[in-house]
Amino acid sequence: MELFWLEHKKLWRKRIVNICVLLCFVYIVIFGSVLSFQWFSFGSSDDYTSAFGNNFDGYGMIRESQEYGKTFGEDLTDESLQQLVREYQQMEAAGMEKELEKTDWKIINSWLGMLYPELHDPGTYQTMISYVNPDKLTGVYERREQALDDFLENSGQAGKEKEYLLNMEQKVEKPLRYEWVEGWSQLLGSMVADLGVVMALFLAIALSSLFAGEWHDNTSSLVLTTKNGWKKIALTKVLTGFAFTIEFFAILAIPNILSQVFFMGTTGWDLPIQNIKLIAVAPMNMLQAEIYEYAFALFGAIGFAGVVMFISATVKSNVLALLFSLAAVYGPMMVAEYLPYGIQKALDLLPLVGSSADIFRTNTFHILGSYIWSPYLLITIPVMIGIFCTPFTVKNWSRRLKA
């Protein structure tokens, strides 16, 4: 344990590590959460002289939007959808720009485009919610079923795969509950979903020198003469890397959650994720989706840390270790779109390469004759990869020291 604390302090005392943690905190928590809630995403936009076209009043706008959303009742029905559209059109006609910002017009417009494509007018620049006849918005759930069925057919998901997904969808409670959704859409669509891909950059910088740095600092020869031995030190370094990753995640996640609770409260936590994407098949609410996305980021970060430490133990150069580490996560992201779909899905299983937004999708893996919903594997395989790398990290570092 004493050796672990020594390695732990050694890592945290590195200036580059402190800079990485600070920069990532500023980007994720300050800009990505606090300022996004208060200014960038939810500030009112009636003052176009302000930065980003928004005022610094997001807290008040969020509260007013939540109260407005509650006026339509709890269940999403034909009548409540018609009322949402009708009131939006009335406010738009009256020039009530301030009031329009409190509506879920972006979400509702996406519903209309999906459920009522025949009502879309390609000859107008207006969004559908501005011109569609509210009285024609009927059969919401029948149309949703048809939209999901058409989507699966167009995606080539038929037979047992389609049956598997539809059986999952049957567990979604209906009628869907509705309140203000835009806040949760932003939170789950970008604020939390992007956490892992940003962490990857700073984790690579912080951990790529964990083993390779022994040669850079000319301390590798000391390891062979220490009373603890190379194997014990190597295992300690690996544990230190994993511990740092968990601490790094906590430094970002805890303030993020506190910021979310401050600005949004707990309103809407039990809404189904179908409010964000109507044809999502997962029987999950917003809180469950958020827990999944944080777990995805944590387990993916642990898996990626294992990969970075393996690379660091394999090469002697800090620069090469960093470049290979960055290539391990960002390389697959860049080339995936040019590869066959099956290979794209396989690459998604690499640590932090996939997306936690798969909870809104219908992606599956066909393994041993059974279909498995992709989010199940996206949260387990990456951390297993990191753990699997551990013995090879120790072995590779041993070979380097003996060489």
Model-derived segments and spans:
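Secretory targeting signals
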Residues: 26-83, 133-214, 235-314, 318, ...
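Transmembrane helix boundary and interhelical loop/hinge segments in multi-pass membrane proteins
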Residues: 207-222, 226, 230
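Central hydrophobic cores of alpha-helical transmembrane segments
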Residues: 21-25, 319-332, 350-351
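Short hydrophobic, aromatic-rich alpha-helical segments embedded in or entering the lipid bilayer
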Residues: 344-364
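Aromatic- and glycine-rich beta-strand/loop motifs that create alpha-glucan
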Residues: 1-18
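Membrane-helix interface segments
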Residues: 16, 229-230, 317-322
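Alpha-helical transmembrane segments of multi-pass membrane transporters/translocases
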Residues: 17-20, 300-308, 363-403
